[in-house]
């Protein structure tokens, strides 16, 4: 009996392992009129930390960030911000208290809401699962690579 269960478990695991795995890459998306096509990971981090607050054409950068408890937010906090949730909150409280920014990031609650706001707000930038990108937004290359390319840094 144990041998039968073990062989069924191995067969099921083998079948799962052969299924294609969805991309877990995070795409950085901007309003279509934003005059940026490529950012280094360092430049992206500077934007997300609000150290750079304007695009080259002097349009204010509007940062849209997913609400807590989303996989995309957790990934971005770890990879781009290099902070946990508590450090992220404290960072923005301190930044606003020192009057370094007029406001913190706008919070979005879904991919659909993210896309709708990026489309509607000139200068906006955000992140979504690369599998959910639509033609309504512009995907920014990071270090010269798109989310579908090997070596993309946000995977």
Residue ranges and their predicted role:
Residues 13-17:
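Sec/Tat signal peptide C-region and signal peptidase I cleavage site
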Residues 18-155:
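Exported/periplasmic ABC-transporter solute-binding proteins
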Residues 1-11:
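Bacterial N-terminal signal peptides
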């Amino acid at each position: 009996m144990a041998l039968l269960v073990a062989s069924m478990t191995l067969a099921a695991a083998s079948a799962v392992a052969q299924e294609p795995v969805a991309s877990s890459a995070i795409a950085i998306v901007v309003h279509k009129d934003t005059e940026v096509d490529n950012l280094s990971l360092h430049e992206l981090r500077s934007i997300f930390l609000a150290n750079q607050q304007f695009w080259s054409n002097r349009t204010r950068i509007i940062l849209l960030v997913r609400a807590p408890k989303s996989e995309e937010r957790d990934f971005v906090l770890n990879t781009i911000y290099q902070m946990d949730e508590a450090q992220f909150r404290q960072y923005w409280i301190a930044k606003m208290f020192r009057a370094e920014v007029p406001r913190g990031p706008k919070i979005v609650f879904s991919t659909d809401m993210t896309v709708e706001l990026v489309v509607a707000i000139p200068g906006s930038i955000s992140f979504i699962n690369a599998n959910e990108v639509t033609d309504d937004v512009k995907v920014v290359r990071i270090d010269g690579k798109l989310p579908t390319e090997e070596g993309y840094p946000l995977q």
